[in-house]
Amino acid sequence: MGYGLVKDDGSVFIEKEATEGVYQAEQAGASAAEVLSDGLEFVPTKELLERNNRTSTVETVVSRVGQKSMAGTVPTEFKAGANEGDETETAALYEALLGGKDALLERTSLTSHTTTKLFLTGGEELQYKKGHIVKVKQSEIAGVDHVSPIVEVDSTFGIESITLLVPYGSAFSDNVKISASTQFYHKSGQPTLSVTNYLGGEIREKAIGMRPVSAELANFATGQLPEMSFSLEGLDFAREVGTPLFDPAYDSQEGAEPPVVLCSKVYKDATELTLNSLSISFTNTLGFLTSTASCSGKISSRVTKFQVGFTINPYMENDDVDLFELFEDNTGFSIFGSSNNYGASEDEKEQVVAFYMPNCRIPEITTGDEDGILTDAINGTAHRDAGNDTIFLAFI
């Protein structure tokens, strides 16, 4: 018998399940996720069934236990893969949260571009959709790499193109490249996950049939490292003695790092906002299917509602009340932001992370302050509209 398991000697592996509720062990070292140590937890429970029996005493009789449940929190850094177009090592969590995933290939554009429109070889525009966030590799020719959401895809013969939300400072160069990337957006049919948490590297804890019920993009604040934390619920659990089947292989070993939130612009529509912090919350409402034939009680789950909210605190302008008017008139607008690391120069943006909410509303606005400087403290909501999903996340 031994004691003294060390917390940070543990590792976490995440796999999509082929069949919901059937445990999927790790298939490779790349299934490991480099999670944050603080806040990581899994809580197995059984429903307590109290027995209110009269037994000639006020003492209670032994309770029984019913349905099994598993809840967990997986905090992570909000970062891209080491190389352009790579999936982030936590891609399974994002796919389980949102459902939709597109892997975009690098494209070389044609000529005669504008500050927002890029012309493409016919057919190459078809991989894009409204809301995808792209990086134009302008630094390879002359200038600074440019990151923006797509607001229009045109497949008209002879003028196949994509149009960007945020204009570049001048017309894009001929034959400029558009980066490969991985994009996530909401789509039904999200996979369930098996999460294996190795406690101290010696005890195998299994969380089975897990779905994210909520997530939060936090710490997107001046000079900080952004984080994405996932809260999950599932169908079943188990714990046994066991060591990892594979040595963990982390993105950081290949050079992936979270960006520092500096030179990280946030836009309302195509207008840059001056703010100190931003957060985005995701909520999946789950409905569980149960069966008397199941030994754990729950047999499946479904996402019955998806909601996105955000908070921003732009500094209050001294010559307009535009944000208050958006609140008063319930007018829609978009929010887009990104952060990145750098390549050989600060013109070359690498390991870009970005978010885009095309259709936002402000149900609540108050007056706040940052070190005594007035701000508009905004609680907003994001919604789907014609041709757009509620939110897009991009890793470039």
Predicted features along the sequence, with ranges:
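Signature of extracytoplasmic/envelope-associated structural regions
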Residues: 1-396
